[in-house]
A protein has these predicted regions:
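Short, solvent-exposed beta-strand edge segments and adjacent coil->beta transition regions
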Residues: 3-7, 63-67, 112
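Core segments of cupin and vicinal oxygen chelate
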Residues: 9-49
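Vicinal oxygen chelate
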Residues: 13-16, 69-124, 132-136, 143-151
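Short clusters of small/polar residues that mark proteolytic maturation junctions
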Residues: 34, 53, 128-129
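Short glycine-biased active-site loop of nucleotidyltransferases that positions the nucleotide triphosphate
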Residues: 39-42, 58-60, 106-107
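Short beta-strand/turn micro-motifs at beta-sheet edges
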Residues: 52-58
Length: 151
């Protein structure tokens, strides 16, 4: 029945600035509606992001309402800190890890490598990549440490 997640929405204070920001991440603008709503493709015809202009973007942050994670390749993730900085975006601390490189959160047979950053309105964003966990590691660590252990 369910094939995937088609759309998600975030509140923004300046629609044009947010369109520029998300276009800079590689999303493609599809259309706008009455200068208050924009839809950008994450993956054409598969998933998109709706940006709603709002006077109430200062909602208290909670990851269940203002968080989007974009799936990226492992190679893309490895380059993500410099890629974000080159675009003028600032990676941020998350789960106690400084944004010097992606970090890994392990689960049983797999793990997620990730880096976090915010959009101009403070919406929480991340680049994430699912990776194998052949040694069933349970500790969180930086990706470079993970790769050293899993050589």
């Amino acid at each position: 029945m369910i094939k995937g997640l088609y759309e998600a929405h975030l509140p923004v204070s300046d629609l044009d600035r947010s369109i520029d920001f998300y276009s800079g991440l590689g999303l493609k603008l599809d259309h706008t509606f009455e200068d208050r709503l924009a839809f950008l493709w994450i993956e054409k015809d598969k998933s998109w992001l709706g940006l709603w202009k709002s006077d109430r973007v200062e909602l208290e942050y909670h990851p269940s309402i203002r968080h989007i994670a974009f799936q990226v390749s492992l190679e893309g993730l490895k380059n993500s800190v410099s890629w974000l900085k080159n675009k003028g975006y600032k990676p941020r601390e998350a789960f106690g890890f400084e944004p010097i490189e992606p970090f890994v959160m392990p689960h049983d047979n797999y793990a997620h490598a990730k880096i976090h950053f915010n959009d101009p309105d403070g919406n929480s964003l991340e680049f994430i990549c699912k990776i194998d966990n052949p040694n069933k590691i349970t500790n969180r660590m930086y990706l470079s440490e993970w790769e050293e252990i899993n050589k």
